[in-house]
């Protein structure tokens, strides 16, 4: 399938290191993580992928801490991690050490008390009773309505915020196949007027090939499971993909 966007040069043969800020240090803060940057650079890490850094919704929260993937604002920092200034310091230092930074982006849904639920309720899907809902049974999030073009532009504006204000280098897009592929095309086309970015999709390209016209990389789970089966059981059990 022909790609619609070029791959940024530094992303060829790169590696990606996932950062869970809450769990990475005893403090669970950006400032505490900052001290680890030289060590990570020395290890040969090239791209830091931060799991969601946005604040977590209170309504229907999972446990006492909540899920990173149920955000209450797309343009704020989770206060338990620190401030935008703290995160910008990480990006500046990472860049100085030759590393890039991408952030997790959750476009399909928000937390149940996201600021848009009050300011822009039309941004959300509703069930037959007229209530916000999630189609996949996740009870701490509600689905966004991608038929609403104003919502699409608001989402792109929020993504742009992190590029302009903090200088991030790309996005890891959570459950990317749940969001229409034409939105990702629209977002990439507009956002790369600012700078060329790296786009990583959480999806299997063997099952969602059309998305790879837009994304640079993805998770080939089907191939991974097939190769593991080959290792564990032998070639006679492998079916052609």
Predicted regions mapped to residue ranges:
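Active-site-proximal helices and loops of the catalytic beta/alpha 8
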Residues: 158, 164, 174-241
